[in-house]
Design a protein with these regions (language model features):
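Short hydrophobic-acidic sequence motifs that mark active-site Asp/Glu residues
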Residues: 40, 200, 231, 372, ...
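A short, sequence-level motif marking secondary-structure junctions
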Residues: 11-16, 365-367, 390-392
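Aromatic- and carboxylate-lined catalytic core of secreted/periplasmic carbohydrate-active enzymes
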Residues: 5, 228, 237-239, 252-388, ...
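Short, flexible, glycine/charge-rich loop motifs used to bind or transfer phosphoryl groups or to couple energy/partner
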Residues: 31, 127-130, 188-193, 218-220, ...
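Active-site mouth of glycoside hydrolases
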Residues: 2-212
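Structured core elements
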Residues: 42, 58-60, 230-231, 272, ...
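Extracellular glycoside hydrolase catalytic/binding regions
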Residues: 136, 142-280, 286-298
Length: 425
């Protein structure tokens, strides 16, 4: 935070927030997210869905004649309002100055491509200056585009340099949102890992079910220099799975839970949730993109969104800065469909069993002689105590229920630490 106080990144995806919602709607959305424990909202200034030419809720477009050096004050006053309303609610804005199609349109983008290195730096400097005193801004360059060549890379570097020129290197927290890429690419690391402006790496792991999320996290987590890592776009709730709803159906709360718990236990410092109906702020009067089912103002209460706080609550209920991913705690991680993922601190262990399969834990890897364990339910935050035992190298644990949708988290603590119940602040 602005006071230097750490917080857990629990993000939501609202790409069209500035572009499509009016002030009353934006306020309602932000309050809903604050109540559900979200701490970051990712939103785009020059938005994806014809953001340069289709005006915002007040009839304003962002630029004069698509010129990034000529931003229009009336459009940005609406952005200002939303940024400040978020601050009142203790929410950070993960601000994308532009969607990636304004740099590289690609086959499916609207564009037009308006940026070069010169005007990207100028726009970065201008927008950085406008928000340099807002303490709740985290800068996200990119926007669902991988640079196609060195020219694109140079444009993004120029925009970053412009922002830093206005905000200051130490104050401009910045990353880059790419398209999905390979395990050995490391998300944003592929192009920018050595750049000083890139403070942490971001992935898009995409909208299919059986993605090896943990391999991607592990690779980026271990890169040098060390930079934190985050999945900025995993599978969204209520999204056509792999863009093929006819054969694969629509993603569920369980799909988004799996992605969140896998990512965080594999080394991410937080997580961004998304919902297909919400990123586009779908409403009955809007042209739908890829078959949304609900208007955004109903989708805000889908179960997956309400379950994200149980992840945040658990992480915050134990010392979170000593936590590391550690698969050596368990003997068998199983397969992609029934994966088991483990993480620990000095005096606690968390193990996520995605379908409630039993597993064996080396509890000797944490402090103390005696341990106490609990089952934590990621669907509702409920806790079941297992009691105390001595530590041991091979201790078997069997979740309370098993099967598709029956995910469980085992919490093991050094009993001498007298931690609060899992998930309690």
């Amino acid at each position: 935070t602005a006071e230097g106080k750490p917080f857990f990144w629990m993000g939501d995806t609202a790409w069209e927030l500035f572009h499509r919602l009016n002030r009353e709607e934006a306020t309602s959305y932000l309050k809903n997210r604050a109540d559900k424990g979200f701490t970051v909202i990712q939103a785009v200034v020059l938005a994806e869905l014809d953001g340069l030419h289709t005006p915002n809720a007040y009839g304003e477009v962002p630029l004069e004649n698509d010129d990034p050096t000529k931003p229009r004050e009336a459009y940005f006053q609406h952005v200002d309002f939303i940024v400040r309303k978020a601050a009142e609610l203790n929410i950070f804005i993960g601000m994308l100055p532009t969607w990636g199609d304004k740099v590289f349109k690609a086959q499916w983008g609207t564009g037009p491509e308006i940026f070069n290195t010169e005007n990207a730096r100028g726009y970065g400097k201008w927008i950085g200056n406008r928000y340099k005193n807002d303490k709740n801004i985290i800068w996200i360059l990119g926007g669902d585009r991988n640079p196609r060549n060195e020219t694109d890379v140079a444009v993004w570097r120029a925009m970053a340099a412009g922002i830093e020129e206005s905000v200051g290197r130490e104050k401009a927290l910045m990353t880059f949102h790419p398209q999905p890429n390979g395990v050995q690419d490391g998300g944003s690391a592929k192009w920018f890992h050595q750049d000083d402006w890139l403070d942490f790496n971001m992935f898009q792991t995409g909208h299919c079910r059986e993605i090896l999320l943990w391999d991607r996290m592990e690779y980026a987590y271990n890169l040098k220099p060390v930079k934190p890592v985050l999945d900025g776009e995993p599978i969204y709730e209520d999204h056509p799975v792999c863009f093929n709803a006819n054969e694969l159906g629509t993603s569920s709360a369980y799909d988004v839970r799996r992605a969140a718990w896998f990512d965080v236990f594999a080394g991410a410092f937080g997580h961004t949730y998304g919902c297909h109906d919400i990123w586009q702020m779908y409403a009955p009067n809007r042209t739908p993109v890829n078959g949304p089912h609900l208007p955004w103002y109903l989708a805000v209460d889908l179960p997956g969104a309400g379950q994200m706080k149980f992840l945040r609550n658990l992480i915050e209920s134990r010392p979170m800065f000593e936590r590391v991913p550690d698969q050596t705690l368990i003997t068998d991680a199983l397969t992609v469909s029934d994966r088991i993922q483990a993480t620990r601190g000095n005096d606690y262990i968390f193990v996520y069993s995605s379908v409630g399969k039993k597993f064996t834990v080396n509890t000797g890897k944490i402090s103390g002689n005696e341990i106490i364990s609990h089952w934590y339910n990621p669907r509702n935050g409920e806790v079941k105590e297992n009691g105390k035992t001595r530590k041991g190298p091979q201790q078997e644990f069997v979740p309370p229920t098993s099967g598709y949708g029956h995910d469980w988290v085992l919490v093991i603590d050094d009993a001498s630490k007298n931690f609060k119940r899992p998930g309690q602040k």
